[in-house]
Amino acid sequence: MAEGNKAVDLTSLSLEQLSEVIKQLDSELEYLSTSYGQLGRAQLKFRECLANVNDAVRAENDGKEVLVPLTSSLYVPGKLNLGNSKLLVDIGTGYYVEKSAGEATEYYKRKCEYLASSIENLNNAIDAKSVQIRAVQNIMQQKATATTAATKSS
C-alpha cells in the first residue's frame, strides 16, 4: 500500500539524512523546472498557431500562394482560399480537425489560457520547493555549527 506524505521533524535528522533530503528536493525541483520549460515551449507553439490563423484569414491573403507542411521537412505549394474559410487544426498526436477561423482562434486561445494557468501553478510549486530546500539547508547549517561548537568545547 502506498502511504501518504508524512511530516518529518527536520531537526531530528542527521546531517547525512538531511543531505539525502536535499538531493531528493533538488531532483524534484529539476523535474519541475524541466516541465516548466516544456509547458512554456508548448504555449509558444499555440501562440504561433493563433498568430498564423489571424494572419491567414486576412482579406489581403485571399488567393495567396503558400507552402503547406506535410512533414517537418516536406512542403507542397498551396493557395489560400478564404471563401472556404475552414482550417485544419492540429489537436495533437497527429490528429486534425476542420474548424472555422473563429473556432480555431477560440481553440488556440483556450489552449494558451490553460497552459498559462498550468505554468503559474508549476511556478508556485517551484517556489515552494525552493523554500523547502532553503529550510533544509538552514537546518544543516545550524547542525554543522552546533557540531563544530560541541567538538571545540570537548
UniProtKB/Swiss-Prot annotation:
Recorded protein name is: Probable prefoldin subunit 5
One GO MF term on file is: unfolded protein binding
One of this protein's GO BP terms?
Answer: RNA polymerase I assembly
Q: Which PANTHER family match?
A: PREFOLDIN SUBUNIT 5
What job does this protein perform? Binds specifically to cytosolic chaperonin (c-CPN) and transfers target proteins to it. Binds to nascent polypeptide chain and promotes folding in an environment in which there are many competing pathways for nonnative proteins. Required for normal cytoskeletal function and when bound to byr1, is involved in the regulation of sexual differentiation.
Q: What is its main location?
A: cytoplasm
Q: Where in the cell is it found?
A: Cytoplasm
Kindly list the GO CC terms recorded for this protein. cell division site; cell tip; cytoplasm; cytosol; nucleus; prefoldin complex
Q: Which InterPro entries match?
A: PFD_alpha_archaea, Prefoldin, Prefoldin_subunit_alpha
Family annotation (Pfam families) = Prefoldin
Name the family: Belongs to the prefoldin subunit alpha family.
**Keywords of this protein's UniProt record, alphabetized?**
Chaperone, Cytoplasm
Whom does it interact with, and what assembly results? Answer: Heterohexamer of two PFD-alpha type and four PFD-beta type subunits. Interacts with byr1.
Q: Which CDD domains match?
A: Prefoldin_5
